[in-house]
Amino acid sequence: YSLLVQKIITTIDTDLTADLTLNVLAGKMNVNASYLSTLFKKETGNTLTDYVNEKRIQHGILLLHSTSLQIQTIASYCGIPDVNYFTKLFKKKVGKTPKEYREIFLKGGKKK
């Protein structure tokens, strides 16, 4: 990846709770938002928003596996304060709601 895209990825991975919108990230890097959007998509194959959401959902999965935190708290820790939006995104990416996912994981864990 180019240095700019590497910096964006590092910024995203470092703090998922930050405001990670295209305009904010472009401003932090002193580049045009349209340029950043095009470059990020060209180099990663994903839009910036999709990349951020993917990372947030991956973090949510990790927290569902490793903690007993409430879904609302997990959503906040993933940078999505609206639990309904988090649930919608999670279901779109994973195919199950966070609650369903946790229940399946816990049942699987008990069988082992």
What are these regions (language model features)?
Residues 23, 34, 70-73, 83-84, ...:
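Residues within helix-turn-helix
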Residues 2, 19, 68-69:
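Residue at a beta-strand N-cap/secondary-structure junction
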Residues 88-112:
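…primarily DNA-binding HTH/wHTH and HhH modules…
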Residues 28, 77-78, 93:
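Residues within the alpha-helical elements of helix-turn-helix
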Residues 36, 40, 85-86, 90:
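Short hydrophobic/aromatic patch on the recognition helix
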Residues 18-33, 37-38, 42:
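C-terminal accessory/binding modules appended to enzymatic or scaffolding proteins
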Residues 10, 14, 42-81, 103-112:
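Terminal helix-turn-helix DNA-binding modules in bacterial transcription factors
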Residues 15-20, 47-48, 97:
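Short helix/strand-capping hinge loops at secondary-structure junctions
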